[in-house]
């Protein structure tokens, strides 16, 4: 059994790149802007705003969303500073923004897209956000945008046919309690490592912003839009195995390092960690919703999952898989349309 490759979004600026197909995440950031302004205004101590202010995006990927995320933060900090001091932040604060992702992330595309009118200095920080990537007490605000949902590895036994934890599906559907517990245990461990690392890197009373998706308590993953589309990918891979295009064993051993937690699970993990206080746990209304157009859906999924499928099954099989996904999305239109909603969240944590 081969290990699951590292998950990196499709780079470049082509029609199937993550840069061109990350509007859903970007819409969440735009919808959250006012709430980010409010929580920074309320929870960021003015004493932390010095002549150098550092912001880090952990899991920045290669698309433009990271620029929206950090600009939201900078705008909020500047607004607070101007309102409470009466001084022009341009004269007194230099912003430093650190973009973190795995070393094989497409940082070239990322930096080629830097906004021309930006008011910050920037640098890449390659490395896994499950560990420390920055010096102690070196940043004032950190942000993770749709990155807190990843796990560092597949839970033990999940990909082993001889294990009682063997998962026939490519993700945690929520219908197998043993599989769900294994994924939750792995997610809890990884989340602890993330929070511990960020607590070291943040200055005292610094803020950590988490944006992403979680399940409403009691909802199973495969009852939601995101779970259904993952099921479509899995069904397409099974079809290719039946056609002899890819090996059945490879399909049955393929799982992704993703766990969409329930709201209550997230709260419990953060509270038990003890390094942060939850200052806000907001439900963000996604203005445009999920795409129901089968072609757009398939291309969007390819931008996020194409890299990992190509590494596991080969580029040709990956292309065929997403052709099948588009066809299956037509067939499952009603199921997608009536999927149970997930919660899009903004969690604001203050370092204790």
From Swiss-Prot:
Cofactor(s) for this UniProt protein: Mg(2+)
MF annotations from Gene Ontology: metal ion binding; methyltransferase activity
Cofactor notes: Binds 1 Mg(2+) ion per subunit.
Protein origin, superkingdom: Eukaryota
Pfam families, sorted: Methyltransf_7
Positions that bind S-adenosyl-L-methionine: 18, 59-60, 65, 99-102, 128-130, 145-147
Binding, Mg(2+): 167, 252, 254-255
Residues involved in substrate binding: 18, 21-25, 146-150, 300
UniProt cross-references to Gene3D superfamilies, sorted A to Z: Methyltransferase, alpha-helical capping domain, Vaccinia Virus protein VP39
Biological processes per GO annotation: methylation
Assembly behavior: Homodimer.
Name this protein carries in UniProt: Paraxanthine methyltransferase 3
Classification lineage: Eukaryota, Viridiplantae, Streptophyta, Embryophyta, Tracheophyta
